[in-house]
Structure formats: structure tokens, C-alpha cells
Amino acid sequence: DDLFLQAGKAYARMRPLTVHRNPEHWYDLGEATQRPLAELDVVLMRKDPPVDAEFINAVHLLGFAEREGVLVVNPTAALLQCNEKLFAQQFPQCCAPTVVASRDDVLRAFHAEHGDVIFKPLDGMGGTGIFHIGPDGRNIGAVIEQLTLRGQRQIMAQRYLPEIKDGDTRILLVDGEPVPFGLARIPSAGETRGNLAAGGRGVSRELTERDHWLIQQVQPMIREKGLIFVGLDVIGDYITEINVTSPTCVREIDDQRGTDISGMLLDAIERRLA
């Protein structure tokens, strides 16, 4: 609600921000001022999904500032084009068997073929709305009905990857280059979701040869779209999502590995501004 458009120019209510390394009191905000976004050098778009109408409207407003020369990270065109779950499907060689549909018969046929399937919405985050349906198909009708809103909304069905027990690994790319360590988000007991927001624990690990191959597959398009900060989600040998809205796990990797991912990102931004 701080963004608005007037006479063809994007404005925002802004406050200076000071960040502290104290989980009990980790930031301070200064006095609010109302200014045109064109006065800024950079805007970091870090609004979390869902990518709903309000998210899309905010991106469109940032596009007005972008056209006045402000660097928006990530670029507005890429944010509008790259649904985080569908974007990965542009690299089928990197993905587990997947179907996207709203039709009950298509989703049931996929489950019948693969037996063990994850169903999830296309616009969620943090493991919300994710269901695991086993070979017995128990509750499949209720899950499909709930997620598709009785056939009115497209959802994703993906073959279940048992490697999730070893973690859903977040791999961060800064200006197309990978951070050398990922964060394996390991599900808690009885869970199939590794997301930290769903109770998973994060363990940093070095990237594997397969990870580097996956990165090489997506790098050209990521660079072509001007994406500066990207998070790949990898389970076993497969990419499950390509996060472009608000990639996380920076602090967890930095704390375990002594890296400075924020510094890498700011260096990349400064290179774009030079």
C-alpha cells in the first residue's frame, strides 16, 4: 500500500532502514517521506508470493520507475513472465515427470501412471497447499477438488521424489553465477515438505556435479532475462522450482559457511549501475 501512481510517475512512502544482528530487535525505521521512485538507484522487489493481483499490480507500478532508469531487482518483465513453478518446466530435461492441469481426469491419470504424486498450487510459497498422495489414492478427489477449486484453477502434479528425505536444496545464483554452497532443507519427522517455514531444518552442503549440470542448463535463459537473484530448488537430480520473487536461505548459508551472499548481490547490482 506504500506504492502509488500519479500523472504517469511511480511514487512510494519510504523510510530509512537500519538493520541489526539481533533477532529480538533486528531493524529500526526512520521518518516516512513520500518521494518518486525515480529518485532511487535501485528497488529490490522482495514481496513474497502468492503472485496474486496485488503482486502483479505492484510489479506494473515498479515498471514505471524502471522506464525512468531505476534498476529493479529482479526486472519487472521477468517477474511477470516467470511463474516460479512453471518456469522450471521450460527445462524438461531438468525436471521430474510433471503435469499442469485443472481437469480431474488429467490429474487422476497422472497419479494412476506414477502412483506416488505431489499436488500443489502454482502460486504458493513456504510449502503451503502441498499434498502427497500415495499409491492407494486416498483423498485424491478431495485434494484435487480443493486445489483446483472444482476445476477452475490450474495446479501442478509432480512425481514424488523420495530423495526429499535428504533435503530440498536451495541453490542461489547471483547474476547467473552460483553460490558454491546450497542449503538442504530437511523435512521434520513425518513430513514431505522441507521448507523451513514448514518446520524443516537447514544444513548447508557443497554443490554436486549434477547441481552444476542443472545450473548450466538454466544459466543462459536466466542471463537473457536479466535475472540478478535466483534460487533453484533441487530434490535429488531434479529442479522443482526456480524462485525469482524473493529467494531466501541467505542467512542460513552465510552462518554455516562464512560466505557473504548479500555482499555478492550488492556487488552485482553495483556492476549493473556502473
What are these regions (language model features)?
Residues 76-80, 185-187, 235-238:
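Short glycine-enriched loops at secondary-structure junctions
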Residues 1-71, 78:
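ATP-binding N-terminal substructure of ATP-dependent carboxylate-amine bond-forming enzymes
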Residues 69-119:
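Hydrophobic alpha-helical segments and helix pairs
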Residues 59-66, 85-88, 107-108, 144-145, ...:
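Short amphipathic alpha-helical segments and helix-helix/interface helices
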Residues 189-190, 206-274:
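ATP-dependent carboxylate activation and anion-phosphoryl transfer catalytic cores
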Residues 46-53, 92-101, 130-131:
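Flexible, glycine/proline-enriched loop segments at strand-loop-helix junctions
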Residues 105, 112-116, 123-214, 222:
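Phosphate-binding site of ATP-dependent enzymes
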